[in-house]
From Swiss-Prot:
Tissue specificity of this protein: Isoform 1 is expressed exclusively in heart and skeletal muscle. Isoform 2 is expressed in heart, skeletal muscle, thymus, prostate, testis, ovary, small intestine, colon and spleen.
Alphabetical keyword list: Cell membrane, Membrane, Postsynaptic cell membrane, Synapse, Transmembrane, Transmembrane helix
Name of the protein this chain belongs to: Sarcospan
TM spans (from-to): 54-74, 87-107, 123-143, 194-214
Keyword GTP-binding appears in the UniProt entry: no
Species the sequence originates in: Homo sapiens
Taxonomic lineage of the native organism: Eukaryota, Metazoa, Chordata, Craniata, Vertebrata
Amino acid sequence: MGKNKQPRGQQRQGGPPAADAAGPDDMEPKKGTGAPKECGEEEPRTCCGCRFPLLLALLQLALGIAVTVVGFLMASISSSLLVRDTPFWAGIIVCLVAYLGLFMLCVSYQVDERTCIQFSMKLLYFLLSALGLTVCVLAVAFAAHHYSQLTQFTCETTLDSCQCKLPSSEPLSRTFVYRDVTDCTSVTGTFKLFLLIQMILNLVCGLVCLLACFVMWKHRYQVFYVGVRICSLTASEGPQQKI
């Protein structure tokens, strides 16, 4: 009767802490770094602060503009150059693909398609990226063929044109004429350098288009199902109330 009783909620000597010390706010799950995220809160993968598919679209746009500019510079050297030898058309197609990708990724992109419009835009971007890959491969092939010919040409200036021939023992060998050229060095030097630049740019651009196709395929057939599985696991591993 004379001994003082310990206050309620105070830890006894040698025993576990009393459960009464925890207030009602402590029973709620705390949100921190270890707290499970909700199903709709999947963080997008980033690269240098930018989402990875968005970075691919930006690369497509930059490379497409570069290919287009170099192609028009090549066309200005001679008026007799074929369209296949000045692949500005490949850059224009890749720029259109990039514009569609930027619109899709910045406005209405979702990893799991929730509407028919999102699915249609992703499918169209996938098909156009495949088309961009095809035209880039063609541009590389045409540029490489013309570059290999320029390395074997013997050129001479005639009036306002440059006439080039392949070394051959036949007297009637084929002659390539580059009109509106005052100096053959613009063909054997400048144009040859532009062909090499086009091969490099179109090769990189084709790889970026291939990677864009892979990312679209992966988001369609892999990330969607993995996201559903993670959501089910996080829902089952939620905090359980102790009895």
